Amino acid sequence: PVLTMKYFISQFMADIYLLKEAAVSNDRKNLSKLKKKAHQSGKRALNNSKKVALNCVKTLRLMGEYYWLIGKQKKALNWWDKSIKTGEAMGARPDLSRTYFEVGKHLLAPGSKYKDLNGITAEEYLDKAKTMFIEMDLQWDLDELDKLMAGR
């Protein structure tokens, strides 16, 4: 299960990337097919994460990213809420901090219908992420956060 977990997570991440690229380039021809493929790989990763808790928080975060990408923001927030609660319960700090970052980033996005999740604003999630990135010396993540803030 551990080796298949890495494969399923990688496949899901690749499918999300391709879906993002198709959405950005307005590739309507492939969008439907890529949505379906990402959904299937997400379900496989999610089912596998139930057997191997190692990447559970990451998988839940990616499910949120998938649903946000396809325009289902409320579902995305529900997945991110699950990711946060699971990350807090498991003490999975790196993935929890990355979930905070994703939530903050998406709540700040121009097309966001929501301004908070569980009463916590985008800025507060980004502050939480930054604090954790610094504590864990996650320089790449900190650089990504800095890029986001510079672009605001």
Q: What are the residue ranges of the model-derived segments?
A:
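Helix-coil-helix junctions within alpha-helical repeat/solenoid scaffolds
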Residues: P1-R152
